[in-house]
Amino acid sequence: MAKFGEKDEYNVGLMAAYGNARSDSKSSITNYKSSSKIDGYGFGLYGTWFENPTEKTGAYLDTWAMWSKFKNEVSGQDFGTEKYDSSGITASIEAGSSYKFGQSEGVSYWIQPQGQFIYQDVQLNSFKEKSTGTLIDKGKGNIQTRLGAKAFLVVPTDIAASSNYRPYVALNWIYNSEDKLVKLDNSYYGISGNSNLGEIKFGVEGQTSKNSYALFNLSYQMGSNNYSDFIGNIGWKVNF
């Protein structure tokens, strides 16, 4: 951690992560169903600048880059289970500013406009599908742009002097430079309708101690061609 002025602060460090995800999908045309699961880990670097970390107001800039490796499993309705690995780099730069516009009985009210660019280049390792022998190859990298705003409350707790929890709602516009594609032999296939997305997100973030945080959120994304996605996350972070 470094201070460059009377108030501002810059934090840099190393990070490690583990993730697990499950998903189910259904075709609106054929009614075919499929399911998938992913287990992965990653290592990376981060850096964050705060204009006024003591009062939690003003601008911030957050950057990070991570290399990740995943084990993937996909099961189709009329096909067997396919297993494959994927790995690659993800990097992000996010900027925003926090504004406090009220307080009542210890609870403060905030609004935070945000913008973010995410470079996503996690690619699958090429493999042949068991049932058909089709060569499945890597797709294309993506740059995701997000613009939005988050409204939240800061509610102090009695657990510790530095602890609080922050329920919030966020509205975002998300743009993806590339569709989610996979290459089968010499042709690309993917999901259409996710280039421009509207997102609404509800969640709560909790500072359980000076160095630990917990989070939970649910989000719903809507795009063109009847594209929609419902996402939930739960996590815990500790700073050393």
Q: What label would you give each PLM region?
A:
Residues M1-F240:
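Membrane translocator/pore-forming domains, dominated by Gram-negative outer-membrane beta-barrels
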